[in-house]
Structure formats: structure tokens, C-alpha cells
Design a protein with these regions (language model features):
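Membrane-interfacial helix termini and adjacent extracytoplasmic/periplasmic loops
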Residues: 127-167, 222-259, 329
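Transmembrane alpha-helix signature in integral membrane proteins
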Residues: 68-84, 164-194
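Transmembrane alpha-helices
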Residues: 209, 214, 268, 273, ...
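C-terminal transmembrane helix and the adjacent membrane-cytosol boundary/short C-terminal tail
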Residues: 271-274, 278, 285, 312, ...
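Interhelical loop and adjacent transmembrane-helix boundary motif
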Residues: 325-376
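Membrane-cytosol interface at the C-terminal ends of specific transmembrane alpha-helices
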Residues: 181-185, 189-194, 198-201, 205, ...
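Transmembrane-helix boundary motif in ABC transporter permease subunits
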Residues: 88-97, 179-211, 224, 386-394
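Interfacial/capping segments of alpha-helical transmembrane domains
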Residues: 23-28, 64-66, 115, 119-146
Length: 398
């Protein structure tokens, strides 16, 4: 610890010495060029500040029981940084350019890290999915109509390779997503229109934060809501109509998922509508348009790119949802498009396949990566198509 303090005081000494040298150089430059030059802040000021913060860090490390050699290393690094920083305070030093360079490099580093993480995820998914397709033919996976990986294992031996047909899983994912979007999209868009154009500002300021808070509720809470309230309600309602409905149905899961998604669409659509220029409102009303004509023919088309973006976000959330499906729709894959039947989704099956003590190299476990790969590709294609649609609307609206 004593050596660490010595390193910091040595840094202060270097800063003070360099400060005197630099001031002398600047005075000479001032005399030669007859200009009024002055430091924005003296180098010793930066060294004092840096040393104080470094000393605080060293004290915290010492109290935390960190090894003394590590503390000494940090002190020496701090001294080097101070020395380098003070050395860079030259006559022609331009802090603005250096900060701009540092900012650009930071942005480049952040973008590179994001790209590398994405590539790493893709490599992991593609690699493990490739192992799965070496065991199970891709034709069987993408076109098979029987999904029951539990039957494919018997004492660790693969016995039934025809149990990995993923069509029922993808069909269930599509069904629940459609139910959720049929609930969330109309309510979200109409609620945003009402919130933006008809509500008072005080009412809007009260309701919008509440709706945004709903978006942060854990999905397991929505799952309990579906199991305890929505599923029994649908059971009672359809029972009065003499219509049979499963206790774990795609309708209850999709309905609750739609409720969960409403705040996303409503909040983003509200922001999009408020970003439409006021001149378009006034121009439409001046031409004799009714409120309905103004909203349907002027406001909504102008905000359509952002609305499509909110719908894309909602679809991605619906496709990736797991807990609501596991709790209220079950894990049984069926070849059905009836929302009153029980079904499952790809994400729920991924959780099911990765749960337990089975070997990582088994086809049952590797099947989860095949499902993940399919979801990744489908979502990627969907986002590309959505970007094309957004550009089309942007060109159409000028």
C-alpha cells in the first residue's frame, strides 16, 4: 500500500515538473508570436483530480482485500496515464480533434463488439444445428408432421428418428402469434389514436406512463393471469355456448400475449402520430375533411413506417415469448389450426428440450438448436421484408 501511495505522489511530481516546463515553453511561444495563449486548465489540476480518484479506488481495493501487487500495478498504470496525459499538453495540442477521434473510435468499437456478438451467436446456432441435421434429415425436420422427441430416446439410444417433424411446432407458433396480433394491433393503434388526438394532455400524461409500466411486468405474471382468470373465463363462456375448448388453449395464451404486447404498439404508435407535422392536421381540416378522413387518409399513412416498426417489434416479442405459452397453452404439439385446442410454440419446445440431464450431443438436445436456427432465419427474412415495406411507404409519402 505504501508503494502505491509512492507511485501516486511520483505522478504528482511528474505533473508539476511538466507543468513548469510547458508554461515556460508557452511563455517563449507567446513572446515570439505575440499571441495571448493560456491553458484552459493547468496540467497539475488534472493530475490532482486523477490522483484523488485513483487513491479512492486504491483504498476501496485495499478494504476489499485485493492483493497488494494488484494495487501496485493499478497505481503504476495510473501514474503512466497521468504522465502520458500531461506530456500530451503541448503547444499544438488540439483537444477537440482528439476527443472527436476518441468518440469515433468508441463508436466503431461498440459497433464491432455488437457485430462480433451477433456472429458468435450465429456460429453457435449454425454449428449445433449442423450436428443435428447430420443425425436427422432436414426433410424430416421441416416437413415431418410428428413432433415427440421424448419417444426418440430409450435408455440413451436413438430409436425413433421420425419424431422430429417440426411442422406442428411452427404451426402452433403461427397460430398463437396470429391470435396475439389480432388482439394487440387494433387495440394498440386505436388506443394510440385516441391518446394522441382525443385525450386531454393531462389525461395523456397520466395514462401513457401507466401503459408503459405494463410493458415491464414479468411475463410469468401474465402467465398466472392466463391460468387463473382468462382460461377459466373462456372455459365458462364457450361452455355456455356448448362449444368445447381445452383448458390449455391457444386462444387463452394468444389473448394474454396480445394484452402484454398492447403497450409496445400503443406507445410507439403514439410517438409516431405525435411526430406528424401539425400542418398536415390543419391542411386536412381546412379542406373539409372529417376527423375520420383526416386520421385514415392523412395521419395513419404519414405515421405508417413507424407503425409497421412497432408491429414488427410486437411480432418478434410474440414469437419469442415462452412463459405464457408454457403456463397456459402447454407443451403438446398438434397438427391443428383451431385456437380452441392446446398447442405449443418453438420457444416453449426449446426450453423443454434443454431441461433435464440428457447429453448435450443427443438429438433431443440438438433439436433445440434446429428450432432456434429456423426462428432466426424466419425472423431475419421477416425483418428484411418489413424494411422493404417501410421504404416503400416512405417513398410514397415523400
Amino acid at each position: 500500500m505504501i508503494l502505491s501511495f509512492f507511485a501516486l505522489f511520483f505522478a504528482l511530481y511528474l505533473a508539476k515538473t511538466l507543468e513548469k516546463k510547458l508554461i515556460y515553453q508557452q511563455v517563449r511561444s507567446k513572446i515570439k508570436r505575440q499571441i495571448n495563449f493560456k491553458f484552459h486548465s493547468l496540467p497539475i489540476h488534472y493530475s490532482y483530480c486523477f490522483s484523488i480518484w485513483a487513491l479512492l479506488l486504491l483504498i476501496l481495493l485495499y478494504l476489499a482485500g485485493v492483493n497488494g501487487f494488484l494495487i501496485l500495478f493499478i497505481s503504476l498504470v495510473a501514474s503512466f496515464i497521468i504522465f502520458f496525459a500531461i506530456y500530451r499538453f503541448r503547444d499544438k495540442f488540439n483537444a477537440k480533434n482528439h476527443l472527436d477521434w476518441l468518440f469515433k473510435k468508441s463508436l466503431l468499437l461498440s459497433a464491432t463488439i455488437g457485430i462480433l456478438i451477433t456472429i458468435a451467436i450465429m456460429m453457435a446456432i449454425f454449428g449445433e444445428a449442423g450436428k443435428f441435421f447430420k443425425i436427422i434429415a432436414w426433410q424430416e425436420f421441416f416437413f415431418g408432421t410428428k413432433w415427440n422427441p421424448q419417444l426418440a430416446m430409450n435408455g440413451g439410444q436413438e430409436v425413433v428418428k421420425s419424431s422430429f417433424g417440426a411442422v406442428p411446432v411452427f404451426l402452433g407458433t403461427l397460430l398463437i402469434t396470429l391470435v396475439a396480433m389480432s388482439v394487440a394491433v387494433p387495440i394498440g393503434i386505436m388506443g394510440a389514436v385516441n391518446l394522441s388526438l382525443y385525450c386531454k394532455s393531462s389525461t395523456r400524461d397520466l395514462l401513457k406512463p401507466i401503459l408503459e409500466i405494463l410493458a415491464g411486468i414479468p411475463t410469468v405474471v401474465y402467465g398466472y393471469f392466463a391460468v387463473i382468470f382468462i382460461a377459466p373465463f373462456f372455459k365458462l363462456f364457450f361452455g355456455l355456448l356448448n362449444i368445447e375448448i381445452a383448458s390449455e388453449s391457444a386462444l387463452s395464451a394468444g389473448f394474454v400475449m396480445g394484452i402484454m404486447i398492447i403497450p409496445f404498439i400503443l406507445s410507439l404508435t403514439d410517438d409516431a402520430i405525435n411526430s406528424v407535422p401539425r400542418s398536415l392536421y390543419d391542411g386536412a381540416l381546412a379542406m373539409g375533411s372529417t376527423n375520420y378522413e383526416m386520421i385514415s387518409r392523412v395521419i395513419i399513412p404519414s405515421a405508417m413506417p413507424a407503425i409497421i416498426g412497432s408491429i414488427i417489434l410486437a411480432v418478434s416479442r410474440a414469437v419469442g415469448e415462452t412463459m405464457i405459452v408454457v403456463m397456459s397453452a402447454g407443451l403438446l404439439a398438434k397438427m391443428t389450426f383451431n385456437p380452441l385446442d392446446s398447442t405449443t410454440t418453438a420457444t416453449a419446445q426449446i426450453v423443454s428440450l434443454l431441461s433435464g440431464d440428457q447429453e448435450f450431443s443427443s438429438s433431443k438436445t440438438l433439436a433445440s438448436f434446429a428450432l432456434a436456427l429456423t426462428l432466426f432465419v424466419v425472423t431475419f427474412i421477416f425483418n428484411i421484408l418489413a424494411l422493404i415495406v417501410i421504404k416503400k411507404y416512405q417513398k410514397k409519402n415523400g
